From Swiss-Prot:
GO terms for molecular function: heme binding; iron ion binding; oxygen binding; oxygen carrier activity. This is Hemoglobin subunit zeta. Keywords: Acetylation, Heme, Iron, Metal-binding, Oxygen transport, Phosphoprotein, Transport. It comes from Sus scrofa. GO terms for cellular component: haptoglobin-hemoglobin complex; hemoglobin complex.
Length: 141
C-alpha cells in the first residue's frame, strides 16, 4: 500500500495532471500503440491515427479512471470494480497491456511534468499504477 508521503505526491500531481487529462490520455494511448502495436487488436473499430476523435475520447476515459483511482486512493478496488469486470469478462484484455499502459503514462507524465516527476514522485506513481493495474486484472484470477 501507499505511504502517506506517496499519497500526497500523487494527489498534488493529479491536480496539475487533471487540467490536461485529455491531452495526456491521448498521448499515452498514442505512445502505447506506437510502442506496443499488438495493443491495437483490442480496438478494431477505432480510428487509431494520432489525434483521432476516438483516440482522444478513449484517452479521456483512461485518465478519468485514473482520476477515480486517485480520488479513492484508499479503495482503488471498489472505485474500479466495474472497469475491472468490463476488461476481464467482456473485452478480455491481456493483463500485460495494463503494465504497458502504465509505462506509457509514466513516460507521458515525465514529458509534461519534468520538474514534478522526481525520482520519489516517479516511484510513487509507479507503485500507484501497479496497484491500479492489479485491480484491473484481479478478476482474471
Amino acid at each position: 500500500s501507499l505511504t502517506k508521503a506517496e499519497r500526497t505526491i500523487i494527489g498534488s500531481m493529479w491536480t496539475k495532471i487533471s487540467s490536461q487529462a485529455d491531452t495526456i490520455g491521448t498521448e499515452t494511448l498514442e505512445r502505447l500503440f506506437a510502442s506496443y502495436p499488438q495493443a491495437k487488436t483490442y480496438f478494431p473499430h477505432f480510428d487509431l491515427n494520432p489525434g483521432s476523435a476516438q483516440l482522444r475520447a478513449h484517452g479521456s476515459k483512461v485518465l478519468a479512471a485514473v482520476g477515480e483511482a486517485v480520488k479513492s486512493i484508499d479503495n482503488v478496488s471498489a472505485a474500479l470494480a466495474k472497469l475491472s469486470e468490463l476488461h476481464a469478462y467482456v473485452l478480455r484484455v491481456d493483463p500485460v497491456n495494463f503494465k504497458f499502459l502504465s509505462h506509457c503514462l509514466l513516460v507521458t507524465l515525465a514529458s509534461h511534468f519534468p520538474a514534478d516527476l522526481t525520482a520519489e514522485a516517479h516511484a510513487a506513481w509507479d507503485k500507484f499504477l501497479t496497484i491500479v493495474s492489479g485491480v484491473l486484472t484481479e478478476k482474471y484470477r
